[in-house]
Amino acid sequence: SGVLPTIISRCLVFSIPPLGGKQVERWLIKERNVAPDTARVLSKMSCGDPGLALDYLENRENLKVFAEAFVSSMKISFKKDFQGLHLWVEELGSWGRGQTQEYFTFSSTVISEIAKYKSMGSGEVIFDWFPEISFKTEGFSKLLKYSYLPMFMSVFDEGKIDIGRNLNPKIVLFDAGIRMMEIF
């Protein structure tokens, strides 16, 4: 166990850019026989990453957990509910680092989708795939000002990076929650 960090620090990591949403959408339809509507949602949510899209397809319940956590965080942030923030941090703090990073990626993608929805007046958002989750995209899009977008993206991107740096997930999540409260 003492040698593993040394080995990892000597490894070279190559970031491979995602294929792109349209290519992943076509691949899901052709190779996995996924319905076009589902393929479109999955390609958007995976940001063009076929592995993540396939993971979401095969593990819908994992995606539902992220959607519920996102909705909860937005409600807590808007209400400036510190008690709720504490409970949310405790719940998400028990997740693994990889799952927490995926949550931050998921959240930034959702904010982007909602911004597109706001600018176009319609469109698909991940919550369309989960009718059992109570989230009013139209109502939230009215609260979301375009000036908030860089701040939201910064919170989610920095959270993902901080988790990758092995910072304490509870501290990162609490910081993200406080910063989101400041945005509203």
Question: Model-flagged regions — what are they?
Answer:
Residues 2-106, 117-184:
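Charged, glycine-rich active-site and insertion segments that engage polyanionic ligands
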